[in-house]
UniProtKB/Swiss-Prot annotation:
Residues 17-42 are annotated as: Disordered. This is Ferric nitrobindin-like protein. It comes from the Bacteria. Pfam families: THAP4_heme-bd (PF08768). SUPFAM superfamilies: Lipocalins (SSF50814). Coiled coil: none annotated. Gene3D superfamilies: 2.40.128.20.
């Protein structure tokens, strides 16, 4: 998986920079809402605003932003469905990135419904050896720790090292593997594989466009 996906996300550097500059014309002035009255910096999802990104996070810099789009999910025991998603990667100047994901169901015509779906939140860090760690909590009652590394400057792969479900949490989802990567059009793509009945199965994936940052 890693080698194939690594090739998928590789692009010409100059083309990527030029495309990013053009796309940023509609997103560069947007950011997360600010409280403005806290004694510490507000979170920012825009590298042009707020505190500077910590030097230790430079290998994860392309993720910073708010991303929105659609994906497909096929949970065990359920029919495949389409979902909408918003993902926020933000920072506050410290050596950590906050992560938040909200999803909602789409109807058969591809239109968003008012039915909320899964939520996730957590934090990412990366050390001097380019080892990424992610702490992730799932709204359906699961907590996991993932470790990984960059595949290149535009793609990052993580694998579960520890997964724990609550008493009412999912019992049919085992350890997982998750890949994030910027596609040739600079959309953020991701796919999540899970150990289901002894086999790693892709059960969630999405393609998201930048709306902030």
């Amino acid at each position: 998986m890693a080698e194939e996906e690594n090739k998928k996300f590789k692009v010409n550097a100059n083309d990527a920079v030029n495309l990013a500059a053009e796309q940023s014309k509609s997103t560069s002035d947007k950011n997360l809402p600010e409280f403005g009255d806290m004694p510490i910096p507000d979170d920012t999802a825009n590298l042009r605003k707020g505190p500077n990104l910590h030097d230790g996070l430079l290998a994860l810099l392309p993720l910073i932003g708010v991303w929105r789009g659609q994906g497909q999910a096929a949970p065990p025991g359920e029919e495949e469905f389409t979902f909408g998603q918003q993902v926020v990667f933000a920072h506050d100047g410290e050596n950590r990135i906050s992560y938040d994901s909200r999803t909602w169901r789409m109807d058969d015509d591809g239109k968003p419904t008012e039915i909320p779906d899964r939520r996730e939140s957590g934090f990412l860090r990366i050390n001097d050896d380019d080892e990424i760690e992610m702490i992730l909590t799932h709204s359906d009652g699961m907590v996991e720790i993932l470790y990984g590394s960059p595949l290149n400057e535009r793609a990052w792969q993580l694998e579960s090292a520890s997964t724990m479900a609550t008493a009412t949490g999912p019992t049919n989802l085992g350890p997982g593997k998750r890949l994030y990567g910027l596609m040739p059009n600079n959309d953020l793509g991701w796919v999540d594989e899970r150990l289901i009945d002894g086999e790693m199965v892709p059960w969630q994936s999405a393609q998201l466009s930048r709306v902030v940052g």
